[in-house]
Amino acid sequence: MRSFYNKCFTNKLISAHSLFCQHVSTLKNNKKECFEDVKRSNRISDEFYSSFLYHSYIENLKSTKEYVYFIYLQDIYYNINIFKNKGRLYISNNGLCNDKLKDNNNNNNINSNNFGNSYNAYTKKKSFYHSFNDLNEAKEIRKKRKNEKSEKNIVEYLLCNIINPNENYHIQNIYNHNLNNNVSIEIHKKNDSVMYHYNNEKKTKTSKMTTDIKLKQINNVYIKYVPYKNKIITLACPNKYYPTLYRYFSSHTNKKEDAEENDKNKNININNVDNRYKEDFMYGCENKNDSEKHKKTTNNNFGDEFEKLKVKELDKILNKLEMLYDNKNNKMNINVKILGYIFKNFLLKNKELKRKIFCSLFFLLCSKMAIIYTPILLSTFIENVNLQKSLSNNIDIYSTNKSSVLLLCAYVFSRVLSSTMNELRNSVFSNISQKISTFVSKLFFYKIHNLNLTYILSKKNGELSFIFNRGCKSITNLLNVMVFQIIPIIIEFILYLYILTYKIHYTVSLVTCFNMFLYVLFTTLITKRRTIIRKHMNKAEQNTFNIFLDSIQNVEQVKYYTNEIHELKKFIKEQKKYEKEAINVQKSLSFLNFGQQIILNTNLFLCMYLTYLNIANDIFPFSYLILVNTLLFQLAMPLNMFGTIYRETKLSLVDIESMIKILVKKIKSPDYGNQMLIKNGNIKFENVYFKYPLNEDINGLEQNYQAKEKDPNIINNINNINNINNINNINNINSINNIYTFESNVKNISSTNMITSSINKLKKWYLDKVKDNKKNVQYNNNDVKKTNPNITKNLNKEIKENINTHLKNHKIINNSPNYNNNNYLFQNFTCNIENGEKVAIIGKSGSGKSSLIKLLLKFYEVNSGNIYIDNKNIDDIDLYTLRKNISVVPQDTILFNNTISYNIKYGNFQCTDKQMIQASIKAELHDKIMKMENKYDTIVGERGTKLSIGEKQRICIARCFLKDSKIIVLDEHASNLDNENKKAIEKALTKLCMGKTTFIITHVMENLKHMDKIIFFCGKNIYVGSHKNLMDDNHFYREYYDSKNNKML
């Protein structure tokens, strides 16, 4: 039974429960009994229930309006009718069949009126089901009975003598006589209509059954026959690649499996669960009628999703970015190069976007050409009107007015055309910029989830989200600035210069060029200063945001200790810093705008003056003043924004640089397409050495040291030692300040205690040197005499040696750690854990218990040694497979601010709703959920704050049931629970850990006697053994065990 159930539903052919719920809501309780109630009362098994629903799904033929099914369970026959158009489902007892069975078996316990014979009108009373295991079985029957003419079973006769599975048939009519073998069947082979008739000696009146079923070769076969002796043949291959042939459905199931199923389903009341999420959450299908998605298996679903998201393409792009970043020889700015590669890679694979870019540039050019002609048309119009006025007596007024009106219309049309082209450009390019931003967002989000856990945890709250938000916005802003502002300004400027040279005079163009150069130079210099001020403002803003976020996230702690005033003071302090920096930004903006206006108006004055001189000499007409004035004002409009453009571009590049630094970090991407399974769960730790990794900046410094490319700050500070006031005044405070400067620079490299202590020692050593040489230094109030050059040389040499020694202390030579270092948590740790063993991990807090599990999950990398799972080194197992086969129940479960059903399904989104509910029952959670107002649709709140600790732990356990991993980790799972919740959770965990390798991190001693192995962390030593062996042979464990028990007592 279980194998059939798994075959039907883990392959995602259909969710039986969801399909049933599409029909069950229309049943009338006073006439019909709910099919689920029949199932729950142990009169129907999962196998038949699944078969019924699966058939009703795959036989969804357009020409069929009604489906009739028969089920024989627990000595009772049932008939099921589904009316497709009306969406109704009827279930009734087959009274005639039950009476016949009662007479044959003399079973007085069978009640043929369980559901009322009055509903037999809705059913086809004499239909039975049976199936061969495969078509080969039918062929064997055909061989055996090929020459027999008197068949007792018409179905076997047809299979053996008439129906060829490799040809197409269409069964149109079946005439049923009674429970015996009196059957008439019409079979249409291709275009030939043949009537095959089989009669027993006893002839009765026939009745027509409404059956219309197709046979489609061997890849897609549906057959429905009327057999004898309570059976019918049903062969079905619903999927071309994964044929499923239904088995013979026995009326008796294994008692042990029945008992287990009864325990699972004892309290399910599906009618109380909202049907909406059953349909919407199933396999991520948006359309419940999307049969193709329902027919895919779990692995195929995931594989299609994997291909759809193009994860391999993302990995390829990220690897290329890492290579570009490592190539330091290229003279081009690395950030610009990486950004260019991302744009190029994205645009080359999107032909539609190429067309949109071309259209956008075309609209841009048309817009600028139109806006350039507006001042020319206006000037011509004024000149024409002026000419008309002066010569009104000598020319035809009508023709002159006509030309003026045409010029005026052309002027208005050019302005409208320019505006229209601008809007078309905006609408087309907005699609491009948003798609690129979405692409980069997907790339960054994928990268974040594959970064080293230590790096992510080292960041402040909200820092990564801040970088992500600003980086994505900056990409959109940069593209908009480039296309909507920088490129248009360049095009406009070139066109304006051409018109000024061609229409006016080259001197006007030269004056304009010179003033524009001054304008750009002034704007650039001021904006650089403003960028620094703006960075200070952004930093103050981010600090304010971090304080606000941290305070809100810890609001309970604030209220516990009544520190609301303290939090308010801290927030106001940072807010004032932000206020000060924001005022400075506004002041610098005002100064920038003032200087820009001075330059632009000076240029306007000079150009207008030169034009006036030419007009006064009768070289140009009067209208040229308007032409020059309009041209320069149109040029000034985008130039007024140049400072903002420059600043936004610089800030965008800064924000993008922060994002790029994360994108180019080297990672080992999990192979999401790999479906390899860990079968047993045997684990072996072999000579493992591990210590917590240094800060990543120090690691980078070590790499630079190995490559002999030391940090320039260090080199500058070392070289500056030669110039500590030219070593003329060792006592001078500037000398000591240089050491403090060196300390601050190194602290910028790392904030670790190791570095800080080393710098303090260096500072102390230096001051001691100062005191030792103080006696040798002679000075007065005006001059400072030079010290001995040997002292200078020795001092310089010793400082360099101290720095080099400090760096070498952190260096790993030939990838082999310094095993004498006392910072190692594990030294030569070895342990073998067999499949299904229960292993307790105990020891003092901070001794490395959780770190051992993080090594197993590859959150950290071992410094030396190997870890094996099923005799495979975890370095050779991709991260996806590794972590997919390990389930963790942490001490504090974090939930997403979503529904309970979403949080449970987070363990396996490919599960069905029925599997989710069964997991909730196993986790002792279902009853609590059903008491809630919205049941499985209840929102859990931020990080699950609306639920108790026990409820959150049970959700996590339900996730683990759905994940169904071979290795379970319980990390102090019951440390914060009361006794009642502990008992319920222990009961659920007993089911979860049955037959699986289990690690239990705990401080509770009462269960240690039942553990197969105990890993005991004692200082730098780790002891492994059973409870009895450790109690007998290890006095440290004995003392620890006794001390914990005494505390409990």
From Swiss-Prot:
Localization, UniProt: Mitochondrion membrane
This protein's GO CC annotations: membrane; mitochondrial membrane
Keywords: 4Fe-4S, ATP-binding, Iron, Iron-sulfur, Membrane, Metal-binding, Mitochondrion, Nucleotide-binding, Transit peptide, Translocase, Transmembrane, Transmembrane helix
Cited PROSITE patterns: ABC_TM1F, ABC_TRANSPORTER_2
Lineage per the UniProt record: Eukaryota, Sar, Alveolata, Apicomplexa, Aconoidasida
UniProt keyword NADP, yes or no: no
Function as written in the Swiss-Prot or TrEMBL entry: Transports glutathione-coordinated [4Fe-4S] iron-sulfur clusters in an ATP-dependent manner. Required for optimal parasite growth during erythrocytic stages.
Protein name: ABC transporter ATM1
